Amino acid sequence: MDPDAAIAHGEELVAQGAEILDVGGESTRPGAEAVDAEEELRRVGPVIAALAGQATVSIDTSKASVAEAALDGGASIVNDVTALRGDPGMAGLCADRGVGVVLMHMRGNPRTMQADPVYGDVVDEVKAFLAERLELAVGAGIAEERVWLDPGIGFGKTREHNFELLRRLGELRSLGRPLVIGTSRKSFIGAVDGSPASERLGGTIASSVLAAAEGADVLRVHDVAEVGQAMRVAAAVLG
């Protein structure tokens, strides 16, 4: 990971209209290998320091030590794909620092999550999980108004699970917290037409606009300018 390239990319995303930059030093793609805290910090530290004055910065990590250093460096949101399960110190850190927290649903871990995931009703199960994690976070002292929820599109879910979550996203609104959705370039898009990740812009736009229409509050995307334009046009059409 080249910090200079990451900083330049972050600055370009801000220029395109990004309001939050999510910085991570450990891949959470299916099959990704774990990275130790020292290496993770080496990757993200300079990037956060350079970008924190230009936009709101989120640190994508499940390690409390990495999150603490990132917050010291200027990040103000912790995006934890394990929903506070990965490190026993994470909940207390987030409570003590009074920062925003994103809690995401994931079955297993990035190395195992796509190994034949099975649900009875994926929406009901994801909703129950997020409700339980929200309760735990609040019980640990994290202010409820600082918590955002992410159903984890593509994390331990089949193509049909992802589509079902997007169709019924409105059912998660009853949890009472902002919803974060990330569909950008994900494999469920390619499963529709066989497109590689580099050719999934159309599917990213379609799924992002539909997610927003169903109640998503925050969209995590690679193609900020294009998705932003699509959202503005959709808003204009809908009045």
Please place each PLM-identified region on the residue numbering.
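Active-site-adjacent loop and "lid" segments of alpha/beta metabolic enzymes
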Residues: 1-9, 28-56, 61-65, 71-72, ...
